[in-house]
């Protein structure tokens, strides 16, 4: 019960921080981002199993602790992962932690990006119209990332893999969400 109360208080504080457009009421903690991501993947295991999907996690072997707001970080990546599980229609989601980026890639059908672009910052109004059911979640992710000093972009998987040949993923259809950390 105490953990539930603490979790609810953290959620309320995080939502207030979002509404106030400040992180002054939250405490940044030295954290291994890989631990947060691994916990999210574990939390979503039953959902992914029920959908016949697998979430793969690749950590950065040279990872250093970084100051993070745990609740906001969990909201950002939890939302992106849940969207991938709910809308990709694929069989796998890959989460790749690199030095200053996190890639979340699915092998689903993808979406038509506006104006035939292959990359789209998640702030565009037009993008929200293209992705039914995602709009509010992606707006929240974009706002959280902005408050954290991060940037988030959505890529066509094939385009991204053609332009980033250092990423070891199969050349399939799908989407890649990249969160650029500060």
Predicted regions and their residues:
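Short conserved segment of the HATPase_c
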Residues: 111-126
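Glycine-rich phosphate-binding loop
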Residues: 130-140
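Short helix-loop "hinge" at the ATP-lid/N-box region of the Bergerat-fold HATPase_c
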Residues: 83-85
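Glycine-rich ATP-binding loops of the HATPase_c
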Residues: 149-168
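Short beta-strand/loop element within the Bergerat-fold HATPase_c
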Residues: 92-101
């Amino acid at each position: 019960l105490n953990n539930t109360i603490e979790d609810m208080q953290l959620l309320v504080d995080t939502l207030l921080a979002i509404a106030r457009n400040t992180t002054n009421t939250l405490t940044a903690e030295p954290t291994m981002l890989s631990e947060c991501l691994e916990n999210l993947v574990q939390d979503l295991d039953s959902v992914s199993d029920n959908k016949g999907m697998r979430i793969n996690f690749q950590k950065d072997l040279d990872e250093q602790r970084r100051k993070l707001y745990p609740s906001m970080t969990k909201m950002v990546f939890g939302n992106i992962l849940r969207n991938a599980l709910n809308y990709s229609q694929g069989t796998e989601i890959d989460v790749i932690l690199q030095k200053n980026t996190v890639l979340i890639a699915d092998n689903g059908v993808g979406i038509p990006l506006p104006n035939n672009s292959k990359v789209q910052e998640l702030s565009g109004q037009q993008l929200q119209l293209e992705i039914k059911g995602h709009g509010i979640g992606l707006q929240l992710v974009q706002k959280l990332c902005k408050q954290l000093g991060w940037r988030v972009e959505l890529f066509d998987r094939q385009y991204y893999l053609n332009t980033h040949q250092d990423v070891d993923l199969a050349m399939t259809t799908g989407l890649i969400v990249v969160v650029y950390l500060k």
